[in-house]
Amino acid sequence: MHGLVKRLLLWSVGHPLWAAALFVALSTLAALQLPRLEIDESNEGLMLERDPARLYYDQVTATFGSDELTMVMVKGDIFTAPALEVIQRISESLAGLQGVTRVDSVATVDNISAADDGLEIATLLHDGIPTDPAGLARLREKALANPVFVGNLVSADGRAAVILAFTAPPAGDKTFNVRFSKQVDDVVARESRPGLTIYQIGGPLIKRTVGEYVERDQVTLIPYSVLTLFIVLMIGFRTPQGVVAPLFTGVSSALWGVGLMAFFHIPMNVVTVSVPSLVLVVGFAEAVHIISAYHRCLRAGLTKIPALTEAVEEAGLPILVTTATTVLGFGTLIFSDITILIQFGYAASLALTANFVATLLGIPLLLRIWPTPKRLRESAGEASVAGTALEARIERGCDFILRHRIPIGATFAALTVASLWGWYSVKVDTDFVSYFPESSPIRQRMQDVDRTLAGASAFFVVVDTGRDNGVADPATMKQIAGIQQFLESVPGIGKTVSIVDYVSQLHLTFTGAPGAPRTVPDSPDVVAQHLLLMDRAQTARFIDLPARSANILVRHSLTGSWELSRALRQLEQYVAQNVRGVQVQSAGQAILTNRAADYMAVNSVTSFAYTLAVIGLIHSALFMSVKAGLLSLIPNVVPVILSFGVMGLLDIPLSTGTAMVATIAIGITVDDTVHNMVTYSRQLNEHLDERTAVMRTMVIQFRPIVFISMALAAGFGVMAFSHFVPTVHLALLSVFVMIAAMMSELVLSPILMASTRLVTVWDLMRIRMNAELLRRAPLLTGLSRWEARKVVLTGVLQSMAPGEYAIRRGDLDRQLYMVVSGRMVVIDADLDGIERTLAIVEPGGVFGETGMVGDGYRTFSARAEAATDVLRLDFAALERLRKRFPFTAAKVFRNLATILSERLQDTTTALLYLSSGSDKPRT
């Protein structure tokens, strides 16, 4: 491992006291930030940050008022004196609360009806609440005859009524939703009585409940995750050290991550609530790699410090690369335009960076001060029967996979293609209410309102005429009426209210008989007169002051952005075909969320592509091969595509929660791929045979892959206990991805690795290549130091003790040797057995090259005169060099041809001397 990085990774091993002090200091600083952590229960994070529709929405609400409403449902016999008194008192109480801009109920909204002296425009209760049955019956008749009331404020059967409180929270007041919804609860509690069912539902209560659920998830998910990982670690390591160390760094990583969220003012919301559990699980996985390598070194007979040093060196590179790819992968989310995903991208990237520091600081520190486990100390140097049997089964399985690589690859390809169809069928659906389970009080109340009245949700449809008094034009009025009639025919839309309802009701009162249809006057002057008769406070929500624009309030029970988007498309088609001379545009928080959902559908693909590109570039740089970089993506891409196929098959929507499954999955599963490929590179350098290297890699990595994958699946499974439906979906999909990734790593990776030769940048940096050797070595003539390192890593570096033979006469050996350091002597023996020195080979010198191109039987011996390092190359190694680094290989082949030419010339000269009887020595 390169000097600086190696020193950083091993710093805590050599400086345990300083490392412990630093760890405690960082943990303390993180803990001190926790009180500053913000809980964001709003739905603004679900919207696009730079959406032009957001500016339009602000303009609409400034003109017609807020669409943020709280409903107080009253169920029972509404047209009785006690019930009407309750409705009146609740209306008055809500109107007195801070932030309330308007209250609509049967007690506050004007009713238009005929009177003995002509026309009456007043609230139903303006003369007080009648106590006699006849008076109550007349009140009921008036209310149920008014289209503004029926379905909007009172049910058609008179058994339910609702009080609508529209709110506009003070700017910057983050406690409004909690405070206001609790104040409404107090009002409801005061008015509760036998015979009436009273409850509230609406934006403030929903947002308050979100905040409460976020806090509950923090209280439940993290302990459940710790308990799950504790059980998994006990099964896997069976030592206190193997249990405590990963949990310690995992919990510390979660603490540091949350502390960083608080420090950078990243709130805890319905999406970022999963970050602590995520980093806890990921931190556990990285710790397991180091501890597994450490225990393997102890079993091999190394003492504590050498074992720990080797383990950190072995696992450090994959952990560093995995962290870089994972952080950059999650970092792609910050380029999203959805606030909640941007916040998750920052939070996850910061937390995973903290996890890297905590792992490489905490794990070596704990292992350094922890006594060597007795079980490992006693079994040092011994191979267990069970372990040997498992290795044999792994090798047989790997052999089977390599022999049947084509049908296995075809099976994975077929599943992937089928899953692409499933991905295509995934629907985009995000909605704040859909975050709650069907059994939750929020969903139950919403459904009750939907069944009883016109729906618990609302949005606006604004008709802009572009001219003053344009709304007073009867033609415009009739077009608005047509839009309302169409909307009420769309499934899920229960009621629309506009200025047309007021005008037509007033016109009917003047001109029509009871029961006659309501129509808009044909005369603009009559329409204008009707508008003047109305109370501006009552109609301000439906028409602006210059009568330039009209607002249609749409009450609906549409669930999620999918249904809303379909309804809006139908509205657009109707407007395009039937409406002329005006502009029609929808507005509302639900509309903004819907636009974000459409954006998210595209962003899920682009974010996935960006993540793949980042990982591919890093791996291509690490293994110095675009081919290797692309191959490394396949075991990670396949599980993600399969997960989207499952989403399509099970009709799981793409929401703000599940949209992250691709980024999370590929960010985590890449860990096993990096460990696999780095191990394969090292095994290939040792064995020089792809098949053998693949088998040894799988023997080494099988346990960590299976163990970590199952642990990750269990850890993500804990998130299924979340109170939020998208988090539950994310958990279940992540469990599937972890298992699919495990199968991909165990089955696909061996096939892919066997098809390529891997050399890592880290390996090249490890090779020492001084300028003197480059100058003296004829095989390396014209090569840069970097290219020379590639050549060295293509072959095998062999260390030889003094007196050790590299070649013996008569051996079958087709390798070329280059002395890297030390000295070799090439010797022969005459007929009398007397040894003769044929040549002394110094660093940079080459011997054995003719055996590589000839029949391979050696005619001389080569022995080390001192401690010597030699580089061994055969034709297979040169062929690998040609495929991986063709320009470097061309220089090596040129140099080899030059060396062989010189050897041929030397041999010819020597033969001439011998034939002439000269005794000139051979060199």
Positions of predicted regions on the chain:
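Solvent-exposed, non-transmembrane loop/terminal regulatory segments of multi-pass membrane proteins
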Residues: 19, 34-85, 130-154, 398-402, ...
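Extracytoplasmic
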Residues: 62, 129-239, 478-481, 526-612
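Interfacial segments of transmembrane alpha-helices in multi-pass membrane proteins
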Residues: 215-268, 335-339, 606-652, 721
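Pore- and gate-forming transmembrane helices of large, multi-pass membrane proteins
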Residues: 220, 247, 286, 299-336, ...
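Hydrophobic, glycine/alanine-rich multi-pass transmembrane helices and their short helix-loop junctions
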Residues: 232, 261, 320-363, 368, ...
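Regulatory nucleotide-sensing modules
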Residues: 775-847
